[in-house]
Amino acid sequence: MYAAVKPLSKYLQFKSVHIYDAIFTLHSKVTVALLLACTFLLSSKQYFGDPIQCFGDKDMDYVHAFCWIYGAYVSDNVTVTPLRNGAAQCRPDAVSKVVPPENRNYITYYQWVVLVLLLESFVFYMPAFLWKIWEGGRLKHLCDDFHKMAVCKDKSRTHLRVLVNYFSSDYKETHFRYFVSYVFCEILNLSISILNFLLLDVFFGGFWGRYRNALLSLYNGDYNQWNIITMAVFPKCAKCEMYKGGPSGSSNIYDYLCLLPLNILNEKIFAFLWIWFILVAMLISLKFLYRLATVLYPGMRLQLLRARARFMPKKHLQVALRNCSFGDWFVLMRVGNNISPELFRKLLEELYEAQSLIKIPPGADKI
């Protein structure tokens, strides 16, 4: 199993320069890794065998293929027999009986779970992919030399002066586009989380409404109720009906009882994903409130920089940032998150010294 998910470890390795913040990483990196791990797990026959296994006397390879392609079904009146160990026996009607077509609930999603998880992983990765293109290696260019020159103070001071010249230049429009592109990717993150929620609800036929009660029963320790609810969404066994031609040319109906072993894992995977998607959506929403506060309150931006710069004197910081736009502040914060607080304070102190030599224009004492 480790060999199957080992390639994901390289995807999650921390880079020396972080172009995403923590919540962005959770959405577009960790979530993608989780979805791909679930995909590999569900598609591995080594651990769960064939995705459908039907009981019969002969031609079982054909029966398995037929029931996999055309789908199995359960009765609307699913009976669940609780066992002593908290497990359950699913009996989608007696095998000898025929379930009327109007009472059949076909499990149409079963063949598509792996593909849907794979598609979701690509969709969740899209904002990170777009930002990586739009970012264009700017932060790496600004910060990477500090990681390479950690033991060389002279080169570090030289690069600090390069950064001071960079932030003293007029890149306001460039930095504003940089900020807008990042916020667009954050909006995309939130939109994807909400649309994914709706997609799974449609895919499983009212999944979230039923599974919320299942998770509550699990939290309360009511495993019988958990089994009853999850059996309706992820039945472990189902019936499959097939027509075969007889010797005289007439068709005979054969029905089989089939096991759906992947649903043992599906019920647990989607219980976890249900909680995970809610958590990620809530964090992204909180991040939007934070982003809005930084746009509306210049004093908050100043205090955030002070906290990162080891509480540099406020007046010095105001002088250092008097010609900075909001986009400049955003790029400065991204730089501050990628270098040590000591180096970041030195950068702001040198900016203060550079700005002190320039005559202060009227009203330019705010970011």
From Swiss-Prot:
Q: Which PROSITE patterns match?
A: PANNEXIN
What Gene Ontology molecular function terms does this protein carry?
A: gap junction channel activity; gap junction hemi-channel activity
| Tissue expression notes | Expressed in nurse cells and oocyte during oogenesis. Uniform expression in imaginal wing disk and low expression in developing imaginal CNS. Expressed in embryonic pole cells and primordial germ cells.
Q: How does this protein lie in the membrane?
A: Multi-pass membrane protein
Report the subcellular localization.
Cell membrane; Cell junction, Gap junction
What span is annotated as the signal peptide, if there is one? none
Q: What InterPro entries has UniProt attached to this entry?
A: Innexin
Q: Extracellular side: which ranges? A: 43-110, 208-268
Looking at the UniProt entry, the stretches that span the membrane are 22-42, 111-131, 187-207, 269-289
Would the keyword Transport turn up in this protein's UniProt record?
A: yes
Listed A to Z, the keywords are: Cell junction, Cell membrane, Gap junction, Ion channel, Ion transport, Membrane, Transmembrane, Transmembrane helix, Transport
A Gene Ontology annotation in the biological process aspect, one of them, is: germ cell development
Please give an example of a GO cellular component term from this record: gap junction
Q: Which Pfam families match?
A: Innexin (PF00876)
Record family assignment? Belongs to the pannexin family.
Q: Which PANTHER family match?
A: INNEXIN, INNEXIN INX4-RELATED
Kindly provide the name given to this protein in its UniProt entry: Innexin inx4
Give the originating organism.
Drosophila melanogaster
